[in-house]
Amino acid sequence: MRILTLDEVPCHSWPYQSAAPRGGSQTVWFPLLRGTVDVLPDEVAALLVLSDLQGVAPHALQDGAVALLGEVLADELAILGELGELPLPGTVGVVLAGDLYSEANANVRGASGDVRAVWQAFAEHFRWVVGVAGNHDTFGGAREQVRFQQRPGIHLLDGEVVDLEGLRVGGVGGIIGNPDKAGRRGETDFLRQLDATLRETPDVLVLHQGPDVEGTRLRGSPVIRESVQRRANLLVVCGHAHWETPLATLPGGTQVLNVDSRAVLLERAKPSA
């Protein structure tokens, strides 16, 4: 899969509360960009790709009660689809690249917690949801996570590749780090999982921690870059480290779409006249 175009100006944006760098919370805006890709499954009109939804917002469908940003966005984006401003939600697949939690007051940076409600909110509206856990995501206890992963339309990946109507999506969750900490694994273990996933030739690879782009300020992992950069037909989706420019192409042809704190709607390109 190749991204052909990607708008620089958001078509929609939503205010939300996020933890401020020096304490407390701040109001920031969550943007939605639109782009096109060369190919999608016949029954899929678009992919909606998001990551790092670490905030809260009033939920209009719950009398303004504060909810996780991802829960609010799932409803708002579905409404836009029903209104005809975006593709119908039943024709849109959702890709989540992790870190979907926030404390209720949005005043703790790097808070960890249960994100099943966000996944379920997208699954209720959209065609299917696929993705990985970030280093701040939990899914209940071990048995609860197993039950969650058995829910129809939900595909939480970690070293697997799933075929979704002909689109092969692989994923590896978490980040490289101290394996004694939640959401982290040692470099050797992470790269072993990554290489095993790549051997199954996914069209889209979902990571929470993505590659860097050498010689730029686009931050990420050099060792992940070395693993993914020679795959010309691969689209890597990631978050974790925010890029001012969301799309980059590595020297070997691999495209990297960074959706930290943003959403990107990728629609099938219209045939040339």
Where are these regions (language model features)?
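N-terminal active-site segment of His-dependent metallophosphoesterases
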Residues: 1-117, 192-201, 206
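Beta-strand-turn-beta hairpins that frame and shape the catalytic cleft
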Residues: 37-48, 161-171, 204, 249-256, ...
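A general structural signal for stabilizing positions within well-ordered secondary structure
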Residues: 84-86, 120-123, 196, 227, ...
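Active-site neighborhood of phospho(di)ester-bond hydrolases with catalytic His/Asp-centered motifs
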Residues: 49-52, 93-99, 127-136, 156-158, ...
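Active-site surface patch of divalent metal-dependent phosphodiester/phosphate bond hydrolases
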Residues: 112-128, 132
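Conserved catalytic scaffold of divalent metal-dependent phosphoesterases
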Residues: 34-40, 53-58, 102, 122, ...
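Conserved beta-sheet core of the metallophosphoesterase superfamily
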Residues: 128-131, 145-151, 214-273
